[in-house]
Amino acid sequence: MRIRFFLAILALCGSVTAINAQASLKLPETVKVSPAALNAEPICDPKISASWRKAQEIEGVKIRESNLCSPDNPYLIAAAVKGTNNISMATLMETNLSPDAIIKTDDIDGDGDPDRITIKLEVVELNGKTPDFEGVLPTFDIAPGVQPGAWVFAPKTSGMSTENFESIKANSLLRLPSPVIRVEVGDIVQIVLENTHYLPHTIHLHGVDHPFTHSDGHVAGGDGVPQTNEMFLMPGESRVYEFQPRQSGTMLYHCHVQTHTHLAMGLVGMIIVEENRPNNWLQTLNVGGGHVRYPSVAIQEDFDEEFDLHYHAMDKELHEIIQKYNDPRLIARDMNRLYDITDAKEDYFTLNGLSFPYTLRESLVIAEPDQKIKLRVANTASEMVALHTHGHKATITHYDGIEHNPIAQITRDVYALAAAQRLDLTLNTTNDGLHSYGEGIWLFHDHREKGITTNGMNPGGNVSAIVYKKYLNEIGLPMGLGVDISKYFTHEFHARKLPIWQDLDEAGSLGAPGVRTGFDPEIQNTLFNLFGGFIVGILIYLIIAKRQTALATITGVTSKLRSSKGDKANG
């Protein structure tokens, strides 16, 4: 009876094992995500007029051609060059700028350009929580569907913060990064910060020649540091930061209140001091950075083109704080006391405020053979950037605005930028096997591999490209010879819902696996555990229930063994 019982148990276990093995051999079918089910965006923003790409003259400002998919607004460029006080109302109305956003007056040195420059900046929140509905307002995507909360310095604007009454998207002036500011050596510059935010802020002119105090001796509006130089600029207040730079170079400006969070949130931008030249009307603001379509006289003397490249990175945990609360006290508590930057992990990596594929829209370096191109590069992330250029080796000419000894200047293809560091690079497109390998679509990106991801998804991050004009299509996008890039312009890709290799072959061999036809792996494990426990339980039961019989049997066997040994000894 007992033998038959144990045989039945063994047969049952064998059957379960066989069923389980058979189920595990049945691979699920590949399931493809249909293109019709994707939330896809146009590769180029349809709201941007194709006419903006053309070389044109507005208000006497000769604006260069831009072959980018999303070129800068030429009316904004004209306003930045002439000043909002020196243009027509028709031009001003095309910009969203306030009439007093950029004031240019007084040719003090008589060389044909204004020398007294006033720039008004506001503090703006992007992708913050709104009490009006579930969601964030105004929205600014760094990639399709990716909306980290942010704060930026922005030019003083007129009208709505959104594109229009029906939209929740931020108007074109309200974006990452904070705008690039350009002034000339010797200019008397006033940056007026109007704190339109709900927390205190200041401006620190990082690397820019500026006084510790104003001429009247009052310690206010100098270095921007509340602990040593000035009081917090509270909500609703304004402050003037005045300086007259004596040295040219690529510098920074940023908030110096709770710098560990405010700078990371986006309150940092590039400020460039240009060399003094006659008739040197500058593009005072380069909103969004990238191609400089009205370069300075000094740049035109030595270079064919100029590009501003601002690298930044963001910790998702920090940037979600303003998406949880509307109460400034709770935001201040979480940022100042609960958030621990020593545990921070950067998740978003941007170039000029955007991540791939949006970098293809407006942060390409467009080149032609045999050119010299000026690249001004800044890193405002908390970690190093290892910028690598494919197909080219550029020369580092300046560190933090200071020219490196020309004899010792380094030509290489990886350029290391520490936090807050700036480099000036000369990109030579002469096809000599050293400076350039020839025409093509050549990536440039951070070679710390997490820098080319967006919240861990690749490709993403700060990837962009040096693209020769012959490789651009009619709308300003690279004519690549590889995969179709349209899938990267879908929300599903960045939400990890789109298998990136599903279309590599007709069979979809690397697509998403569907539902298994056999047992689910978790069910298999559960069954194994149940039957294993059942068998162990039966064995324990038999040992306990039959312990008397077992002991008698063991005793009998032991007695027989002893008896047998005794007989042998007597024999």
Label every model-predicted segment.
Residues 380-383, 388-410, 443-450, 461-468:
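Active/binding-pocket-proximal capping segment
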